[in-house]
């Protein structure tokens, strides 16, 4: 029986120092033979981290045969700032953006800039560029959402504005993913929804992150830590 090919992508944090840069490129070179569908690079809140993201995405495009996807958050950003970044990516041959809101201040109404939600960013990008736009999805409901129905409504709005695929928040129980996919199909959502998988390298940090993002960790798994 012929096995179907499983396509994967990898997500990296931008390196913060020379040692991390060396380690990152070792990993990229090690993973390149697997021919991932794309390599994405996260986007931090600080200015220096953002520059690291921009530089790394462009270096991946220049030095490898991999297809990089640049995370781009919009909270506290102006249209001019986003336009400059998008223009730079486009002129560098980058054609894939992971469009996200980013972590807002505690009071979302106090956020500065021209964007409050990822949908604002998607709309802005789609009107000006022909990027492939990937967005987030939340099988276990985003901490700011009221219900799973709201999650589907937001995802459908992202698609209507130009999103071409989605990546889910990480999860530990695959049933949440399957249930989310079933619900998406019933609601006419047809874009690919890629499962987010988090390698556990730091148990304490993983548990804290899971709690923050409303990801339920099975007791059996938690006891292993």
Regions found by a protein language model. Give the residues of each.
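Conserved N-terminal beta1-alpha1 strand-loop-helix module at the mouth
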Residues: 1-41
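Hydrophobic faces of well-ordered beta-strands that scaffold small-molecule active sites
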Residues: 6-14, 37-41, 68-72, 97-99, ...
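Active-site mouth loops of central-metabolism enzymes
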Residues: 7-23, 68-80, 132-150, 225
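Active-site-proximal loop/turn and secondary-structure-junction residues that shape catalytic pockets
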Residues: 12-16, 43-47, 72-76, 101-105, ...
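Active-site pocket-lining/capping segments in soluble small-molecule metabolic enzymes
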Residues: 19, 113, 117-138, 188-225
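Active-site-adjacent beta->alpha loops and helix N-cap segments on the catalytic face
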Residues: 20-21, 47-59, 78-84, 103-125, ...
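Active-site glycine-rich loop that binds ribose-phosphate moieties when present
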Residues: 144-166, 176
């Amino acid at each position: 029986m012929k096995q179907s090919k499983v396509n994967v992508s990898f997500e990296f944090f931008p390196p913060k120092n020379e040692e991390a840069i060396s380690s990152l490129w070792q990993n990229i070179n090690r993973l390149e033979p697997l021919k991932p569908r794309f390599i994405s690079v996260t986007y931090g809140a600080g200015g220096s981290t953002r520059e690291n993201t921009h530089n790394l995405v462009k270096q991946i495009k220049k030095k490898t045969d991999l297809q990089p996807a640049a995370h781009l958050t919009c909270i506290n950003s102006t249209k001019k700032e986003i336009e400059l970044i998008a223009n730079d990516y486009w002129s560098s041959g980058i054609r894939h953006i992971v469009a996200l809101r980013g972590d807002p201040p505690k009071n979302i109404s106090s956020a500065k800039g021209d964007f409050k939600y990822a949908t604002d960013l998607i709309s802005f990008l789609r009107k000006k560029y022909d990027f492939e736009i990937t967005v987030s999805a939340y099988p276990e409901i985003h901490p700011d959402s009221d219900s799973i129905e709201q999650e589907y409504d937001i995802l459908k709005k992202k698609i209507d504005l130009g999103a071409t695929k989605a990546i889910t928040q990480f999860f530990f129980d695959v049933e949440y993913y399957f249930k989310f996919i079933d619900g998406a199909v019933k609601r006419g959502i047809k874009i690919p929804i890629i499962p987010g998988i988090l390698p556990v390298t730091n148990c304490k940090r993983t548990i804290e992150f899971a709690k923050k993002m409303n990801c339920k960790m099975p007791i059996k798994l938690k006891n292993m830590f």
